Design a protein with these regions (language model features):
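Short, charged/polar connector segments at secondary-structure boundaries
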Residues: 1-85
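Amphipathic, charge-rich alpha-helical segments that serve as recognition/docking helices
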Residues: 81-123
Length: 123
């Protein structure tokens, strides 16, 4: 179906295959405070809808890209459970579409992380 939806997602319904211990806790804490202050994240994580969690009855998601943003949101929820309850994210609806969006991630996000050199203009 090739669809990706901007969504507001409960932080507790997201899991990441990347361990939190691999990330810098000081930076996560700083990012968490920025997310709480801005009431959102400027670089939303990309999530794959994985189904219904049998324990909570909530839709569940797995991080495809944006593990740092996800764990910063988790830290934000630890700091302030009410303000950090949700995060804006892009949600891939179907697993068969993950490969297509991974190609986009590779092209748009991994390509220098937006740090390309300015283009010279002639006068």
């Amino acid at each position: 179906m090739r669809k990706i939806q901007p969504s507001i997602v409960l932080v507790k319904s997201i899991c990441s295959p990347k361990p939190r211990e691999e990330l810098n806790e000081v930076q996560l804490n700083e990012a968490a405070h920025l997310i709480l202050a801005g009431e959102g994240v400027i670089n939303p994580p990309i999530l794959l809808k994985t189904g219904m969690d049998p324990h909570t009855g909530l839709e569940s998601y797995s991080v495809v890209d944006g593990h740092f943003e996800h764990y910063a949101a988790v830290r934000g929820r630890e700091i302030n459970a009410r303000k950090g309850e949700t995060i804006n994210a892009y949600v891939i609806e179907a697993e068969e579409d993950e490969k297509l969006f991974m190609e986009q991630i590779s092209m748009f996000r991994d390509r220098g992380r937006g740090t390309t050199a300015p283009v010279a203009t002639s006068s």
